[in-house]
């Protein structure tokens, strides 16, 4: 998926 500013989403 896309990496969020707070937490990396896989």
Swiss-Prot record:
Domain of life: Eukaryota
Subunit (UniProt): Monomer in solution; Homodimer and oligomer in the presence of negatively charged lipids forming a pore with a size ranging between 20 and 30 Angstroms.
Biological processes, Gene Ontology terms: killing of cells of another organism
Name of the protein described by the UniProt record: Cytotoxin NN-32
Tissue and organ distribution: Expressed by the venom gland.
GO molecular-function terms, A-Z: toxin activity
One cellular component term from this protein's GO annotations in UniProt: membrane
Organism, as annotated: Naja naja
Keywords: Cardiotoxin, Cytolysis, Membrane, Secreted, Target cell membrane, Target membrane, Toxin
Main localisation: secreted
Primary role: Shows cytotoxic activity against Ehrlich ascites carcinoma (EAC) model in mice. Also shows effect on apoptotic features such as nuclear fragmentation, caspase activity, pro- and anti-apoptotic protein levels on treated EAC cells. Increased levels of antioxidant enzymes and cytokine levels observed in toxin-treated EAC mice. Cardiotoxic towards guinea pig auricle. Has no cytotoxicity towards macrophages in vivo in EAC bearing mice or in vitro in normal human lymphocytes.
Cellular compartments annotated: Secreted; Target cell membrane
Record has Cell membrane as a keyword: no
Keyword field contains Secreted: yes
Family membership: Belongs to the three-finger toxin family. Short-chain subfamily. Type IA cytotoxin sub-subfamily.
């Amino acid at each position: 998926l896309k990496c969020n500013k707070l937490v990396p989403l896989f």
